[in-house]
Amino acid sequence: MRHRDSLGNDTTVNSGEVEYVTAGSGILQTSAFTPTEHLQSVRFWLNMPDSEKMNDPDYHIIKKEDTKYIEIDGAKITLLAGTLGDSEGYQGKHLPLDLYDVEMAANTTTVLPTPEDRSVMIFVMNGEIKAGGTAIPEKSVAKLSQGDRITIEASSDASFLVIGSLATNERVVWGNTIIMTNERDVEKAYHELEKGTFLKIQG
């Protein structure tokens, strides 16, 4: 995938890599995918605290060589960001983010550690699993309850993402890709887009 943005970045994100974008005070970007027979891409948003929303925007690619591979109870885990046990991956500049890509074979069980201070969710990309005894079908998201570990059972070959961070406990208001804590700031951002004053930092 080719990525271009208002910071001046013009890069290619390859298979197995992660682009880590901090929107901050504002960034405009385009993504163009190379034609291929099979493509699976996931994009999610991590809401920053209101006090950090106007920080400088930033862009970083987590390369495959910067990820770590871990095996727990037969589950093959790619540590993309954050920490897992004693292993550490890429650390963002703001909220802590734990991001794992997990593959499990059919009819296997694994227990993954989950920091008790984190809000954790699972996105099942392929197959079907049970988390804490609750079934999560393919292409579904489940938010986990608080605890220091979670038991995962795979009824078929499965792959899923585990995503964890600190909860901001703040109101979330969004308009398309503008995410704030109140309607006034969302309207202000769109007004700046119309006036051409949205971008505070450009490359």
Task: Show the residue positions of the predicted features.
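Jelly-roll (double-stranded beta-helix
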Residues: M1-G203
